[in-house]
Amino acid sequence: MELKILSVAIATTLTSTGVFALSEPVSQVTEQHAHSAHTHGVEFNRVEYQPTATLPIQPSKATRVQSLESLDESSTACDLEALVTESSNQLISEILSQGATCVNQLFSAESRIQESVFSSDHMYNIAKHTTTLAKGYTGGGSDELETLFLYLRAGYYAEFYNDNISFIEWVTPAVKESVDAFVNTASFYENSDRHGKVLSEVIITMDSAGLQHAYLPQVTQWLTRWNDQYAQHWYMRNAVNGVFTILFGGQWNEQFVQIIGNQTDLAKALGDFALRASSIGAEDEFMAANAGRELGRLTKYTGNASSVVKSQLSRIFEQYEMYGRGDAVWLAAADTASYYADCSEFGICNFETELKGLVLSQTYTCSPTIRILSQNMTQEQHAAACSKMGYEEGYFHQSLETGEQPVKDDHNTQLQVNIFDSSTDYGKYAGPIFDISTDNGGMYLEGDPSQPGNIPNFIAYEASYANADHFVWNLEHEYVHYLDGRFDLYGGFSHPTEKIVWWSEGIAEYVAQENDNQAALETILDGSTYTLSEIFETTYDGFDVDRIYRWGYLAVRFMFENHKDDVNQMLVETRQGNWINYKATITQWANLYQSEFEQWQQTLVSNGAPNAVITANSKGKVGESITFSSENSTDPNGKIVSVLWDFGDGSTSTQTKPTHQYGSEGEYSVSLSVTDSEGLTATATHTVVISALGGNDTLPQDCAVQSKVSGGRLTAGEPVCLANQQTIWLSVPAVNESSNLAITTGNGTGNLKLEYSNSGWPDDTNLHGWSDNIGNGECITLSNQSNYWGYVKVSGDFENAAIVVDFDAQKCRQ
């Protein structure tokens, strides 16, 4: 079946970057970062070997280790032309002078530069120089070694993709010598962020150079040595996570394949790593998931390790839950084990279907053409999402003059919108449920529209930074893809024989944002301009956000505003699948309208719309004064002359920095509208969660926008938000290992009841504690529990409440 796939973003996620079960599982994942890229990814999932590209994405400054901030080289001026030289000594000097940030640009440098910089002579000589430096490494990090190993693996990346680069056979032995020199130092297993920066490059070089077979002892050692002390350091997590890249890449290395089946110590280490209880819910949980995934992949090999592999997998499926505690590891292991082995051997057959019912348990029908399956949305969110899609549908048909007539052979009649509770949940569950990659911000699967009964799927997640009416990330943009595919483009995703990315992404941005796209105006002002001919040739290769989205938007908007009749004529061709005529049409536009396009841009930015920015706290209490500020709002070519606040409770203000008090608890959507001296306006929204004066500051107060639990296990000391449902059953392990136990609930709205038992799920006959105050503030304290498990029941009519269990606590949180 043909899939029309438009994946949003290349953001790294907590669980799988690969497809699940029906398609071959792929590589491990990387750590989730504070930023989220929200751009479209590559259409098809990667199932063949490729060297790892570029430097890993670094953490935001807010999470970066303070002592490493001086290493941020983002402002370094790079001169790749200076690297074009026949002298290896000069190249070494220039590489070390410019540093890793500039060497990183060689991954995407033009072919001419790569062919010069990565000659066999240069690779050999730099590997030898790296060996000399590595032998003298005493730990504590080294900018020089980090840069040199990055250069070496960039060379293999260039060789893989550049047909004009082919290394002579003596290059790889020299590279191996440099890796060996580093591995053999006394500092190889050091624990520090600075060391981790170098170690990361060394470990990925092992994979990129095709040396996966040579370093299995070191892989095993890292898995065995890993502990909570290592896990505290971001760069160590990033570095050691590379061992899973080695295990993944090894499947295309014959020497690796010949020996991996007998690596019993490695199989045990993978299983033990995946079963590390302290990793669950911790910052290295993604690594435990990767360990489970690579353990499952070992089932494809035969040898002495097979029994250990199966035993360790069985332990994972017994210790963790498919949907609950440790599910990231459970699902990762099930991903590969169900593909390479007999699923019945582990009792995991058809787990994907069961998982979908558990996760996407809410159903909401917007109309005969739109149905929502969601994990944890309120009725108000459902209604708001439906309303937004309904508005866009009307605006789309009006703007593109479709007559609401689908293209020929398109039998899609209802879109299914699948919404996960968070990007983390999307990362964990969307892969196995929909058989997609989740290293992105969402995905649209059209399926095969020519098949009657086909159901296209938009797969998304909630995010606090999304539209505050519904909090569904990319809803507006992605819904346009559905409409565009059904009413503008003949066939499925692979049908066009000419490039249409500029149109697909541009029209989605234009309909979703209309004339309010500050990012597009800013890309004109920063000088990163593209001609019409360049825009029309845009692909997803390289994921140039500006070119794909901003300039796609600008080209579409320009044509709609200045040449609408030409757009209508182009759509005649795309709706019939006449791609040769389509290509001739846009080529003519590029020749006729480039000068006009440039003038239009200048007119646009000379009277650019302002940018509204709200600065305020996101939570407060009833009767508490909250300060709101519009002072960070900007205008590209004038000044902001007026502001209008709507606080979401019927109150307004025209002050630039007002204060406001809310009279009742709840979630309020605050909007700010700013107007500039040219009369142009812009709007921003901000959500404020107000709790009652009796709320609990020690518990989450923003559960309206956070992930919620609808069941499963509680971890002592870790507050969680409760799902908005009548009854929730929760278990607490190891309650008999603590002398005292306190269970606290609070915040949100409504009225809940809290019950506890140490001898099974609470009912009228076995209660050991209960609390039923007015509101959500409940407290149970207990001591000397006899049994291992504690059982909690939360019931009532409530929303956005939180709960926490504390061990060795004689009183509840206040």
Swiss-Prot record:
Name of protein: Microbial collagenase
Catalytic activity: Digestion of native collagen in the triple helical region at Xaa-|-Gly bonds. With synthetic peptides, a preference is shown for Gly at P3 and P1', Pro and Ala at P2 and P2', and hydroxyproline, Ala or Arg at P3'
EC code(s) of this entry: 3.4.24.3
Any one biological process term the GO annotation gives: collagen catabolic process
UniProt GO molecular function: metalloendopeptidase activity; zinc ion binding
Active site per UniProt: 478
Prodomain positions: 22-75
Residues holding Zn(2+): 477, 481
SMART domains: PKD
Organism: Vibrio alginolyticus
Family assignment from sequence similarity: Belongs to the peptidase M9A family.
Regions that span the bilayer: none
Cellular location(s): Secreted
Record SUPFAM superfamilies: PKD domain
Database matches in InterPro entries: Ig-like_fold, Peptidase_C_arc/bac, Peptidase_M9_N_dom, Peptidase_M9A/M9B, PKD/Chitinase_dom, PKD_dom, PKD_dom_sf
Keyword check for Cell wall biogenesis/degradation: no
GO cellular component, one term: extracellular region
Cofactor-binding details, from the entry: Binds 1 zinc ion.
Superkingdom classification of source: Bacteria
Post-translational modification note: Proteolytic cleavage might yield three different active forms.
Residues spanning the signal sequence: 1-21
Keywords, comma-separated and alphabetical: Collagen degradation, Hydrolase, Metal-binding, Metalloprotease, Protease, Secreted, Signal, Zinc, Zymogen
Obligatory cofactor(s): Zn(2+)
Start and end residues of each PKD domain: 609-697
